[in-house]
Amino acid sequence: ILIGLVGSEMCIRDRYWEGKSKQQGIMEYYEATLANIRKLDCFDVYGHIDYIVRYAPNQRENYSILDYKDIIDEILKLLIQNGKGIECNTAGFKYGLGVPNPENYVLKRYHELGGEILTIGSDGHKPEHTAYAFDKVPAILESCGIRYYTVFHDRKPIMLPL
């Protein structure tokens, strides 16, 4: 499996947020995500769709994914059209966001638009973070209407029931 993403370097650079509002910074991130997907086809699953929220000033305070629903839809439709999946990453729980990345709205919208390829990750860069909060994933996905998750073998998706 190859995961595409907008690098975390963009989000955490000291100067990224200088001279821009939280809304501008978040929108620029989503625009960069869309540009990456338009240009690159060398991945199977796109991760970190709303990763920017983790590094935004005051994280989720005064943030609503619905403010970005149009560009989120563009991103999801393009991924689906190109046969790409998304990752449900539980690191949001580890970092105090209280939701996975992307949050439930995006997972549900991906499913509503016809997306089927969905992997589960945890940003387990340390052994103790491997599969972090995976016990929460089935209920989250089921609440979004999703009944399957995806694993890959030789870059071929295999759907498994929750």
Tell me the role of every PLM-derived stretch.
Residues 39-47:
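Short, structured loop/turn "capping" segments at alpha-beta junctions
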Residues 48-51, 90-91:
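Short, well-ordered beta-to-alpha junction loops that form the rim of enzyme active sites
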Residues 59-162:
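Charged catalytic cores and adjacent phosphate/nucleic-acid-binding surfaces used
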Residues 8-9, 50-52:
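Mobile beta-alpha loop/short-helix "lid" or hinge segments that flank ligand
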Residues 1-7, 11-12:
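Single conserved hydrophobic/aromatic residue that forms the stacking wall/gate
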